Amino acid sequence: MLAGLKVKKQELANSSDVTLPDRPLSPPLTAPPTMKSAEFFEMLEKMQGIKLEEQRPGPQKNKDDYIPYPSIDEVVEKGGPYPLIILPQFGGYWIEDPENVGTPTSLGSSVYEEEEEDSLSPNTFGYKLECRGEARAYRRHFLGKDHLNFYCTGSSLGNLILSIKCEEAEGMEYLRIILRSKLKTVHERIPLAGLSKLPSVPQIAKAFCDDAVGLKFNPVLYPKASQMIVSYDEHDVNNTFKFGVIYQKARQTLEEELFGNNEESPAFKEFLDLLGDTITLQDFKGFRGGLDVTHGQTGVESVYTTFRDREIMFHVSTKLPFTDGDTQQLQRKRHIGNDIVAIIFQEENTPFVPDMIASNFLHAYIVVQADNPGTETPSYKVSVTAREDVPAFGPPLPSPPVFQKGAEFREFLLTKLTNAENACCKSDKFAKLEDRTRAALLDNLHDELHTHTQVMLGMGPEEDKFENGGHGGFLESFKRAIRVRSHSMETMVGSQRKLHGGNLPGSLSGGIVHNSMEVTKTTFSPPVAAATAKNQSRSPIKRRSGLFPRLHSGSEGQGDSRTRCDSASSTPKTPDGGHSSQEIKSETSSNPSSPEICPNKEKPFIKLKENGRANISRSSSSTSSFSSTAGEGEAMEECDSGSSQPSTTSPFKQEVFAYSPSPSSESPSLGAAATPIIMSRSPTDAKSRNSPRSNLKFRFDKLSHASSSAGH
C-alpha cells in the first residue's frame, strides 16, 4: 500500500505546476459525506507518505529535481525595477495576486468566519477581522439563553460535547448545534421545516460524524457548565499579538545584512509612527510581547499599539540589542525569528525572498515599500506572501496595491497582520500542536462536567465507579471486604438475639455476656440524703486501666459535665450460674462510691484493710467505681466508647455494655426506667465463687440493700 501511495504522490508532484489562481477553494464546513471521506483518505495518504519519507532517508533534493525559480542574485543582476517579492528557488510559498479575482481568500473559505457587522466600530473602513466562527459561537448564540448541553463518553471518536438550541428567525424554526470533538468543532444551523419531530441527540451527532459509533449521551446537570464550555471554546481566541518589523536597505539579500542594520532612516521612522506609539520598555504595564520591561535586556524602546480591543507589540529589528562581533545577531533574531508574521520595510526598490530568513515559526510576510518617501503625500506599495500550507487571508489587496499614508492604510495593515497570524495557525505545523491541545482540554472538560453532574445527582465518586463497573484497587477491595464481614457479624448477632432473648454469647460478639437467665443483676439505690451529703466529699478511688479507660481528666471540684459509670461489686455464684455485674448510675439521683454505700460501710472497709486484703475497688472480681456528673444518656455514650477498646487490655476480666429493656426486679429505685448495665466477667470467677472474699462481698451487698430499704 505504501508503494502505491508513493506512486500516487509522485504523480501529484509531477502535476504540481498548477498556478496559484487555479487552486480550488476549500470545501464548505458541512461537505457531503462522499467529499468528507475523500478528504479523509487524502489526508491519510499524505500522512503515510510523509512518514515513509521520514523513515527512508533517500537522496537529498537537488536543483536538478525541480524547475527552479531564478535566484535573487540573478534578479538583482538583471537590474530594476524589481518585484517586491520573488519566490524561493524551490518554491514552498505563494504570493497574493491582486489582479486575479480568482485568488482564494479567507472571505470565501470555510476555515474562517468574519465577525458580525455590529462588532465593527463606525470609524472603520470596512476591513473585517477574521476569526474562527465556532470559537465565539457559544458566547454569541448560547450563553445566557435556553439551551441544552450533553456529553458523550467513550465513543469511537473519543469524548464529545454537544450544545443544542432551538431558535426562530424570519418566521422559520432552526436548530443551532455545536459539536466538539478531538478533531474539530462543528457549528451549524439546521432548518426544522419538513421535520415532524426533533431528531435525537445521537442522530444529530451521527449526521455530523458519519463514522461515529457507540454514541451514548448524558445531559449536563451543572449550573456553571456554560462558563466551563465557553472557556474551552475560546481557549485559542487570542487578543494579544506580536509582529516582527525588519528594515531592508537597497540591494540587501542576506539575513545577516537585514539584522545588522542599526540606523533608522526618516522614511522608516515615519512608517513606525504610523504603526503605533514608541514606548519605553522600563516598567511598561501593557502587553510586552516577550520583551524585558524590568532589566532592559531587550532594548530601551519599542513600538506598541491597540487595535479593536487587541494589543499589539512590534519587535523592531533596529530597536533590539545589537551585539558587536555577532554576524547572526541572535539577540535580535531570537525575538523576530519566533514571531509568526513579520513586516519587511523596503526603503528602495529591492526584492525580498521569503526563505531569506531561516526560521521555523515565520510563516507569512507583508512587504511594504515606500514610494515617494520624504514628500508631503508619501505612498506605500504592499505585497503579501506565505507558506503553501497557510490558507489565504483578507482583506484582499487592491489593484494596484498602493496605499496613501493615513488611517485607512494603518487599518488595512493591522487587519492584514492579525488575519495573517490567525491563518498561519491553520498550517500543518501549528495545527498539530492545536489538535493535541484541543484533545487534552476536551478530555478535561468532559471529566469535569461528568464529575459535577454526578455530584448534583447525589452520586459520589465511589457510587459512580461502581455504576460504571470500575474499581478502586486494593484499598477499595479491602473496604468492601470489611463491610461484608461487618454485615455478616450483624446478621449473626441479630439471629442470636432472637434465639436467646436479647443477649449473645461472648464467642459471637467478642465479649458480650450470656443470656439473662445466667446473669444476676445486683443493683442498689442508697438514700438520697446520704448521697447528697457525700457529693461534696468523695473518697479517693483508684481506677483500673482496662476495657474502660479514664476518658476525662481534671480535678474533682470542677463543675463541667463528665460521663462516667458507677460499677457495683461482683456477686457470688447463684443457682442460675450468674456472673458479677455492674450498673450505670446517674449522679442526679445518687453519687456514691463503692466503699461508701451506707453509713455502716466504713466498718467492713476497715476490716478489709486490717485483714490485709486489697481495696474492694481493686479486687480480683474487678469491682471498680466511676462517678458521673452527667445524665444517664451520657453515661451510656461513654460506656459505648469504652466498649470499643480491645478486650485484651485487661488480662483479668472481660466487660461489655449491654442494655436491659425491662426494669430489674432488684432495682426498685429506678422504677420502670430502662437499665443500661455493664457486665463483668472474670476468668477467676469459677475458682473464687465459694471463696471467703466472695462471701464477704455478698454480705456487703446485702447490707447495702438493707440500708437502702430502711431509708425508704
From Swiss-Prot:
GO BP annotations, alphabetical order: negative regulation of neuron projection development; regulation of small GTPase mediated signal transduction
Cellular localization per UniProt: Cytoplasm
Composition bias, Basic and acidic residues: 599-612
Comp. bias (Polar residues): 566-594, 641-652, 681-694
Domain Rap-GAP intervals: 229-445
Ranges of compositional bias, category Low complexity: 617-629, 660-669
Keyword terms, alphabetized: Cytoplasm, GTPase activation, Phosphoprotein
Span list, region Disordered: 1-33, 529-712
UniProt-listed InterPro entries: Rap/Ran-GAP_sf, Rap/Ran_GAP_dom, Rap1_Ran_GAP
GO cellular component: cytoplasm; neuron projection
Residues bearing the modification Phosphoserine: S26, S488, S495, S525, S539, S545, S593, S594
GO MF annotation, one: GTPase activator activity
Pfam family for this entry, one: Rap-GAP_dimer
Modified residues (Phosphothreonine): T30
Biological function: GTPase activator for the nuclear Ras-related regulatory protein RAP-1A (KREV-1), converting it to the putatively inactive GDP-bound state.
Name by which UniProt lists this protein: Rap1 GTPase-activating protein 2
Species of provenance: Mus musculus (Mouse)
